[in-house]
Amino acid sequence: MASYRNSRSRSRSRFRRRRGRRSRVRGRDARQGRSSRRRRRGKGRAHSGKKGRRSGSRRRKRNNENK
């Protein structure tokens, strides 16, 4: 009986692990391969431009107030 129970538990754990890993890996691959690359590139360009504009406007406002 012990050997039969062990074989059952092992097979169940394997199926659970495989299913979990497969689903997680698919999600990670899809995100990293497609969307994250596009988002990272887009964000880098957009934020770099916006940061410069924001800091410039803030500096001008401060200078005007001081003057």
UniProtKB/Swiss-Prot annotation:
GO terms for biological process: cell differentiation; chromosome condensation; spermatogenesis. This is Sperm protamine P1. Protamines substitute for histones in the chromatin of sperm during the haploid phase of spermatogenesis. They compact sperm DNA into a highly condensed, stable and inactive complex. It is found in: Nucleus; Chromosome. Testis. Residues 1-67 are annotated as: Disordered. One of its GO terms (cellular component) is nucleus. Transmembrane segments: none annotated.
